[in-house]
């Protein structure tokens, strides 16, 4: 069975891993980095992903960041003169990760396990699966990020029974999961979180502070200047990271804008104490889900054996201190918070292929599921933290006499009234025979698969007529849209490949011209004019093809030049070897002669 890669598709950074033997290994990107910025930019028709895209974010307005925060919504982003869905942008990131994973493995990759925040709803999970499909990946499993982290942490501890709390604060989302580990079973007891809390919010606090201070000093509002704001974002992110290691950092942004008297510069010192003060409310928000998860699991703090920190934002000292204060435990630092989720996803891939044995993952649904009933009430069928996959049925009836159809309004959330919860979809069961209210028996069945994706069935028990839908929210893509996007992605991949081949060819041509010119110069006056003339003619032909920008001609002329240049190089080598041999022969003869001069005749006298 082909390899199944594990992908952590993050808000700020993404990572890809693969199982090698029994060990999960992070695959470095082409720049040698173990995580890749989740940034996509467009330039001259080219799609740029990762580090290169992030570097040009300041100067390129067609750059998209933090697209994960829009997954599961109908919101689109404008770039490159087009509108893109969050699924399409995410697919570009996935395609890039897939590409360099294939380069590392030396084989085609078609399957992946992709992680999502535990608190992602059905629409967000479906959007992630669609993004994988657009990128040419069969998504074998959607796994919750804290669960994946627990897999990576606990794989070598399957003989040990313990309860762990995973505190996962990423770039845009926050999750807390409590798991019980033992005998190879990873049982999620509860999960809680906040999909609107992450490292980006900490950056924003610094940005708001810098904008306010600059306005106070110079009377200019930088928030209206797009380029200045991108520079501030980069500086804020760097300052946040610096303050994880030092207590004070200098923010210096020369020529940030211009005033009446000329250019203005932003110079400011930010202390850790000030940063802690600015972000105090964000840190406080992390405490509620911790308490919620413990309550749902029916556990006290004393029953938690280990606290695992996941996500780059858990490096913030105030966050670490808050975790210590809230749990009464020193966090376990045996895992890399940036890499552990992708590694866990790769392990789950190994479980699917059978390479990892005796491991069972029991995950849960993060939010309750149900339907709207009379009076706008939300009636739950499946409670949050129910182990998945699962199925649950309940019988309902009509609200009016002779009602010919029922509308099924499918919801996800925890609020008692339907209007306050997230609509997953609506469908209708029709042709109900005329009967007084309360007589028809309508059975509604909810199914949640192993990926946390929901399907709902309504059945008239009297007529056995049924209607089934796989939930597709208003942000969901149709099969036709996904197919079109897949074709676009494949076309872009082909165009990117051609572009890379073109760049490689041009580099080879430049290198060949440089090397041949050097060789021709070195062989001047050394007696093999025919070979030099042939190489010079081939060199001139290649330069002409280069000037005409004819790629096919350049390729042909490059091969011809390499052949002629090789002939010249062989002659040069043979001449050098002959000279070396002659020199060694002369030195040998001289050594023999000198040895004869040193011989002294002696007389032997017998005593």
Swiss-Prot record:
Region: Disordered, residue numbers: 580-607
Keyword Phosphoprotein: yes
Entry-linked SUPFAM superfamilies: Actin-like ATPase domain, Heat shock protein 70kD (HSP70), C-terminal subdomain, Heat shock protein 70kD (HSP70), peptide-binding domain
Keywords: ATP-binding, Chaperone, Nucleotide-binding, Phosphoprotein, Stress response
Composition-biased stretches (Low complexity): 580-591
Inducing or repressing factors: By stress conditions e.g. heat shock.
GO MF annotations, alphabetized: ATP binding; ATP-dependent protein folding chaperone; unfolded protein binding
InterPro entries listed in its UniProt record: ATPase_NBD (IPR043129), Chaperone_DnaK (IPR012725), Heat_shock_70_CS (IPR018181), HSP70_C_sf (IPR029048), HSP70_peptide-bd_sf (IPR029047), Hsp_70_fam (IPR013126)
Similarity field: Belongs to the heat shock protein 70 family.
General function of this protein: Acts as a chaperone.
Family annotation (NCBIfam families): PRK00290.1, prok_dnaK
Protein name: Chaperone protein DnaK
Gene symbol of the encoding locus: dnaK
